[in-house]
């Protein structure tokens, strides 16, 4: 990135080929005999020191004063989930740890997901997480239909807000899952000629106005879904130096920043109310129930159960739906056993 010296433009901008050509032309207009290749040769040499703005910010913070600021920031979001402050604290440490490059093997694949009515300042809260000096590394404008740009954003931005999460289509959910857990970026830079491996900095946060938005039961552990019960208090001043100094101090003293099995269980259980249920799942317990102790019931394959539902409510019957229905039965914890004709499940007709 570059910035003009003695200019009123205080922000740094990407140094792409267009910028290099402009610098060369401006220099020639001033009577300096040089070409764009001369500038490129200088820029991409050891004459220009490597600069990481995130690390520059993090490693020039004051000492932490010992007062917790991460959990109180989470508590400005009115919600009924008692685990929210601790989960947000863990996610925040994870975000900072990946800015520092502490974990190159795994990405920060967990994302808070704030669900609430319009006007509750969800997006304002997400934006307030970034310190003002690093605000250019925050974005809420990501088009998942442009996959190359999304992948490059993992290197370009430090925090990405998936605004209007419910607008991510079902066909894009698989790509979103891939992006959330992708630890590095393998792509060709703009105007580049070869594929290079680039470091991932980005963590994710998301917002939505609608509650039934999780379509993949196995993927719910990647989200910290929170129903915002009122307007988020974004009027409190945030001491960014101490907020991030706390994260740096805790990471330096071995505080766990990754989510363990217990955390994932808490998230999965809390996310049930945000799950979007398929028609098959909604009708299953209208026509069947689980067998009680000592009750034999019927042992049926997913296709047999789905055929009965098809006769009752005209649910489409095909191989893809049968495979998905088997996952639904397992998720519901319905007793199963393996037979010669495949896995069968124990149910009683209601």
Task: Say what each PLM segment does.
Residues 1-68, 72, 79-86, 315-316:
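N-terminal nucleic-acid engagement/recognition segments and initiation subdomains in replication
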